[in-house]
Amino acid sequence: MFAEYGVLNYWTYLVGAIFIVLVPGPNTLFVLKNSVSSGMKGGYLAACGVFIGDAVLMFLAWAGMATLIKTTPILFNIVRYLGAFYLLYLGSKILYATLKGKNNEAKSDEPQYGAIFKRALILSLTNPKAILFYVSFFVQFIDVNAPHTGISFFILATTLELVSFCYLSFLIISGAFVTQYIRTKKKLAKVGNSLIGLMFVGFAARLATLQS
């Protein structure tokens, strides 16, 4: 499928894309957290930020940014530390709010949807490893002798985004249902938020120690 556009072993790629999307990461966790705390609208706004951020990174990967990042350690480190700092900030903010006993009901009935989108976008964009990953993964399924490799890259990128959309939609809908239960279980909600905050701190530590 799509062989005429320079795509090799598309079905193998699709299976690989599904497994990759299923691996838990900060983007997935952020979407799930907001679907639980802010409902389906908050979840989809977070997902939208992730989609746009990933699309930008895929375009940069295709445009050659991956090579620049790999050959310029200082650039890689700048983006890496910015991403780690932002993850640490998000994790610390969640933990602080949880320990102080703050919750969405006490703050406001209306979540800050604009902030949710911006945080998701920044979270997605400040991951230099993503650009390197897209190139290393996509190149295995692109015929370098094809006349228009940009089309091949676009097909693979679109497929990955669609798989991600399906999975995040499942998480968002599940999170919205969980919200109805958690609202009556304050202690459970507190434990859940604490775990999410700690996971963000863990993601920050992992990103800070990555090498290009």
From Swiss-Prot:
GO terms for biological process: L-leucine transport. GO terms for cellular component: plasma membrane. It is a multi-pass membrane protein. Coiled coil: none annotated. Its main location: membrane. GO terms for molecular function: antiporter activity; L-leucine transmembrane transporter activity. Keywords: Amino-acid transport, Antiport, Cell inner membrane, Cell membrane, Membrane, Transmembrane, Transmembrane helix, Transport. The chain crosses the membrane at residues 12-32, 49-69, 71-91, 122-142, 153-173, 188-208. It comes from the Bacteria. Pfam families: LysE. It is found in: Cell inner membrane. It catalyses: L-leucine(in) + H(+)(out) = L-leucine(out) + H(+)(in). Exporter of leucine. Belongs to the Rht family. This is Leucine efflux protein.
